[in-house]
Amino acid sequence: MARAEARFVVDRPKGEVLAFLGDPVQVGGCLAFVANTEKTAEGVRWKVKAPMSAITQTPHLDVVFRVEGDSVHWQGRGRHLEIQGTFAVAETLAGATEVACTLEVLPLGALAPVLGPLAAAQVSGQLDYFVREARARLAP
């Protein structure tokens, strides 16, 4: 499993940040590999952008979000990929909100030996992109 971690601070109340991070549409909009978010009868689905969808043969990820206290855990599973993330939020002494993030990518099935090195090479860049986008969207 490929894994990356990051932290960032935004000048917004903790409740607003937690609501943003608990929303699959908002989080999907901050991930470079997500083309759009669809609501289905089963739940929420992220459509995976090309070329990632073609390379991984994973056109979409079925996503589940869970908010528990001051943290959010989400998991997206598709044909050959499982991607999950966690966010833990805390108020700083200055009244801003700090977010600790993790992103994990687990290749599945017959393509796992091929996708494993690709995931390891890209997971940090994917999380960096998320942090930039989330900070921009949460800016006052």
Residue ranges and their predicted role:
Residues 1-43:
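Hydrophobic ligand-binding cavity/cleft-lining segments
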Residues 9-13, 49-51, 66, 90-92, ...:
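Solvent-exposed residues in well-ordered beta-strands and their adjoining turns
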Residues 75-125:
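Beta-strand/loop substructures that line and gate deep hydrophobic ligand-binding cavities in soluble
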Residues 17-21, 27, 44-46, 63, ...:
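Hydrophobic pocket/interface hotspot
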Residues 1-7, 43, 58-60, 71, ...:
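Intrinsic-disorder/low-complexity, polar/charged segments enriched in Ser/Thr/Lys/Arg/Asp/Glu/Gln
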Residues 38-80, 133-140:
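Glycine-rich portal/gate segments that line the openings of hydrophobic small-molecule binding cavities
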Residues 119, 123-139:
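Short amphipathic alpha-helical signal-transduction/dimerization elements
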Residues 14, 39-40, 64-70, 88-98:
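A short, structured loop/turn motif at beta-sheet edges
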